Every structure is written in C-alpha cells, then in structure tokens.
Amino acid sequence: MAKAIPKISSRRNGRIGSRKGARRIPKGVIHVQASFNNTIVTVTDVRGRVVSWSSAGTSGFKGTRRGTPFAAQTAAANAIRTVVDQGMQRAEVMIKGPGLGRDAALRAIRRSGILLTFVRDVTPMPHNGCRPPKKRRV
C-alpha cells in the first residue's frame, strides 16, 4: 500500500495575505491622471515606487460614468485610504490631463487629512508637435 503524502499547507506559519510587511511611508507623491474617459490615481514614495493605485474603473464605475467627477473622487479616496494606514502624513500632488476629475480628485485628497506640500500641473503641452485629431462631428 502506498504511503500517504503529507499535505503541505500554503499558509505556513499562519501567514495570510502578502509576504512583505507594511512599509512606513511618511512622505509620498500622488499622481492624478485625469482623461475625459477615466481618472487614475497613483500613490508612490519619494523614489517613485508605487505604493497604491486606483482608478474610476476599479472603483466600480463603467462606461461613460468613469469620466465623472464623482468617480474621480471615489478613486482618489480608495487610493489614499491604504497609504494613510501606512502612516503617510505629507505628499506632493502631480495632476496631469484635461479631464473633469482633476478638481474632484484634489478635493478628495485634501479631505483625507494628508498635508500637501505642493500641487503641480504636469499636463504635457506640445510645442507645436504632432497634428491633433480632427474635430468630432456629432
């Protein structure tokens, strides 16, 4: 009769969830990318390593509702909730894009209790580069 192979648990040593410990991040950079169709909020440390991110799509909004200010506010709140738990107190904000979610995301960041050192608009502006797409006719 064959020997029974002992079952090896994937949760050895009682560890559940991620293997890395939660880092303490006192200062970070919050990147808000607001397009007309979606808003993406990424929180990084000062070296540029991503700590947390969220978007209007991952927050549960689909279709044209992703471009709304309320969706951007929800995405910003979701991204910041995890880093506040990791001890972030101060942050810089970089806002990129022409979308409706710019101001709503910034309001949600201000309301979270993180002290903002500065807010910078880093929207790429062409110095007469590529030809823009033709205007829509609806």
UniProtKB/Swiss-Prot annotation:
Residue spans of biased composition, Basic residues class: 9-22
Keywords: Chloroplast, Plastid, Ribonucleoprotein, Ribosomal protein, RNA-binding, rRNA-binding
Main subcellular location of this protein, as a coarse class: plastid
Keyword Signal: no
Biological processes, Gene Ontology terms: translation
Region listing for Disordered, in residue ranges: 1-22
GO molecular-function term, one example from the UniProt record: structural constituent of ribosome
Gene Ontology CC, one term: ribonucleoprotein complex
Record localization: Plastid, Chloroplast
Oligomeric form and interacting partners: Part of the 30S ribosomal subunit.
Family: Belongs to the universal ribosomal protein uS11 family.
Protein name: Small ribosomal subunit protein uS11c
Organism for this UniProt entry: Nicotiana tabacum
